[in-house]
Structures are given as C-alpha cells and as structure tokens.
C-alpha cells in the first residue's frame, strides 16, 4: 500500500497481473490506490485484466486462424520494431498493458536504469497476422508510463498531431513509395545484387533483373495484398539490387504502422531466401539511394473528400489553395523536417545532384516545389490532388516524420502562407549564385547541419515535446560525433602516403 500511494500505476499493474496474488488482495489494492493522494491518476486502461467483448472477439478470431502467439510491438528512435511475445491465451492481459519494457535498454528511449518500465498498449485495429508465420499476430502499440501516455512514444507523438488536424477538420492521408535493396553476401565477405545479370549502369525498370528476383519479390507482394494493402505496381529501381513497391495510401497512422511492418516483413522474407534486405539510404556511393517519398493530402474529416484537389488550378498543378498553403508551411520548416525524414549520417550522401552511374540521383537538393518535376523537394504529380515530399529516405521513422511534416503544413494553412510560383525547370542546372538570387536555399548537407536547424526551429519542440526533442538532438549529435571521429578508408587511401 505504501508503494501504491507513491507510484501506483506500474506497481498495481504487476499486482493485477500476478498469478499468485489472491483476488481479495487485488481488490484491496485497487481500493487503496483509488483513495491515495498521488500525482499519478489511475486513469490508464492498463488497470484491468477484464476481457472486453472486443478483445474476447478478437482472441476468438485469431485462434480460429491458428494464431498461437501475439506480439506487443512498438518502435525505438530509429523506427525499428521492439516487442514481447505472449501466448494467445493471455491476449486480454497484453491488450491492457501487461507487457513492460525497460526503456534504458533501447536506443533513444529517454529513461534511466532506475526508472519505472514503460507499458505497451496494443492497438486492436492494427492486428496483423504474420503472412510468413501465421501462428503469430503483430500489434502496433503505444507506450504508457505511470498510467499516462509516455511523452517520448513515437506513435503517440504522431497521434497527438493527427488529433490537431482533426480539430481543424482534416484527415491526413499518406502514401509511401518503398525503395530498398535486396543483396547477397559473397564468400569473401563482400555483398552485391542477387542476380549476376543485374549489372547495368542504368538498371531502372530492367526486366531480366526483375525476373531473376521473381520468387522473393512476388512473395512479398502477395503478402501485402493478402493484408489488404493493394499493391498496384512494383519494379527494379535505379540501382543494382534495388527495388520499389507501390501500394494504396491510407490515413497516416495506418501507413506508419504499415511501413514499420513492411520493413520487418521484407527482412524476414529475404532471410528465408538466403539474402538480406537493406533500408540504408545509400549503400553504394556510385548508385542511386533509396527514398521513401511521402505522398500527402488532406481530406475532409466528415466526408472524406480530398481537399487538395482543384482541376481548375490557375497554376496548372491541379492543386487547391489549401494544398499550396500546406506546401508553404513545409518549405518554411524544410531543414528541421529533413532532420527527421533523413535521419542518418548516410542520408545526406543521397541528397546530391551527382553520385550515380545512371546519370542522376533523382534526389532533391534545394528547398523548392513544382509540378511533375523530380528535381524539386516537393513535387505535385501530374494528376494533382496530392503533394510528394522527395526529401525523405527509407530509414525514416515515419511516426516522427509524418508528425513533423503535418505540423508544418497545418501551420501554413493557419497562417495562409503562399509558396510562390511552382518551378517547372530542371533545378539541377542552376548555380548557387542563381539560387541565391531566386531566394532558394539548399537542404542540409550533413546530419550535423540538419540537427542544428532542427534544434533552432520552435516547431520541433512543439511537435516532439520537450523530452523527445532533447533526446532526438542528443542522440543524433552523438551519431554525428561517432562518424566524425572515425577514420575512413577514403582518408587513409588519400592521405596516409601522400603526406
């Protein structure tokens, strides 16, 4: 009882889920905690193990499909899955927060070893049976601490921003173009494409390269369609061993859950075939990097109507005034956004005009927008009605990236910002002097520069909250320092015998 009166939430959670504590004691603890004077209100749904009809129905449905285990999964600062596995008979407990995690054991979770554990609260709507292992179901989860939403939960940060969009009457819809590498490791420790024929300087849309990878890529596509994601296209991309899948957009939270699951699924399928999947932004200096272009629109929260559509757009982009205001907000905060949508040291080796044997990197370099023109940071595709952010790579933590870019876009709408005229020309052809005269700035050149602008932009703390804001800065700065103090092979080759 003494512990309950000081820190009841997680302690009570342990009691109510403890198999050896008699029911009367559990009830006594509940009564004492309810009357205790505490700064931790007992409002969390983690305080009960009662199976609601929804959870009971879900468990029955999963058991009928042959599911034996469930995963309470969440992401760390990288957007990588972390989880505990629970027998399906204990699904009710898992769904009410029984699975606790020590945050100090993870990257970018701001907790000390002496802190209380965070509890994973699974979202029943995210239940996904693993297509490659149908005995297991995966659940995206929010993190709770002391009975309250954990401030540094990536999924929770996105949900808070989506709630603000809802208050303004909007649903944020999002589609992601998933680019990635599937590679094999050779006996000498080197790695390269699966197919020996995948060696062209311009391998984009290469049919032999696609057909040689038919078994694993069609297995992934079949799984995606089995899950209801509606894949409408997939192809060999512009680098050897690189591929892209395109599937239907959804609301932003669902898409963030799906991208998280997608990366897990692709890695598992590739491993089955003896290969490995890489979501590193640019693994080869002379090849195109892997993007994760954000295709964005706002819909009316009640009718679902796309509010970015305007077939009579005087600027000929088929975009509404609301869409242009959204663009202006994103451009205003582009550098800070880049620190999250391009989160690694390696990310900035993708954001170059040159650096691919195919002739182009296809990546943005400047903070500008335009029509169906891939040299802009923000592109409005030919059909209009949506905005594509090209300054995002496949290593992105989509929960955080979507939250940042949505916040910027909503600011543009609230303030009625104007992005100016769209750029239809090849932006790669301009010199720095030309761009300066046009008042067009460059995207960050390094992670250090991106984090500096992220730290200086007030929007970052507003979106992330003070705890995650500082954690993100500290973590990425340390990543930069680790890289900056490393002596590379390039340096040794260039300088060791030269001086």
Regions inferred by a protein language model and the residue ranges of each:
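Cationic, low-complexity basic patches in intrinsically disordered or flexible, solvent-exposed regions
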Residues: 3-4
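Catalytic-core signal marking the mid-to-C-terminal active-site face
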Residues: 56, 261, 268-271, 275-277, ...
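Histidine-centered divalent-metal-coordination microenvironment in nucleic-acid enzymes
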Residues: 179-191, 236, 240-250, 280-304
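Short, contiguous, pocket-lining structural segments
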Residues: 208-216, 233-239, 251-262, 266, ...
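Short glycine/proline-enriched loop/turn "hinge" motifs that connect secondary-structure elements
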Residues: 128-135, 171-173, 234-239, 287, ...
